[in-house]
Amino acid sequence: RESFDNLGANATFFIVSKIIKLLGNNIINDIKNNYHIGCHSYQHLNLSRLSEKDFDLDTDRAKKILEDIFQKEILYYRAPYFSAEKITNFFYKILSKHSFQYSSSIRLSNTPKSIITNEYNIHEIPLKSFGIGTKKYTIIGGTYFRVTPLSLIIKLLKNAAKNNFIPMVYLHNYDFDPFAKKLKFINLKGKINNEIRYYGRKSVFDKLKGISNEFEFTSLDDFVNE
């Protein structure tokens, strides 16, 4: 929180509701009183593996928990792993059913405008991405943010803004903590993923400070309602 204050930064917190139940009241109240809140599902499952019914149940449960805890209507949604891209046949229908108004769950290489309204009257705020083989390099957050040099991050964000995207940074709580103990894995894949997840954490706040010299940090809700 102190680091965000030093940057003069506001943000949208997309929250996994199963996790928020485990946090103390002080943290919950700090988020409630200082940041815009969105829904990031109930338990952060890959949505492409869920049926329409399962996604419906997960979304209903997640939204009710967040609205009960924060005592406010939750109108924004972000899909875990950007996995809504594979279930667009029912994704927006379910969001509309549960009275969401905004989503930031889709990655596009090009967009005609920064906010796209679909047939269910859900306003999608896409992130810019480009392909590298079978992978999508998303601008910009998580591992991409930690391993990419600041100068390139700023260049990518400016390019996104130039091409009708809202220049967004997305980060997880673990991206900020260089002092957290590493998890122990037996298999090689787990060990490699663990090392990747810790790489570059110490650079995050310096990069955010550098970005703040070029852009003003704000929440999605404040940006939409400017």
Name these PLM-found stretches:
Residues 48, 137-147:
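Surface-exposed cleft-lining segments at the edges of enzyme active sites
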Residues 1-76, 81-133, 149-226:
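Catalytic alpha-helical scaffold of carbohydrate-active enzymes acting on polysaccharides/glycoconjugates
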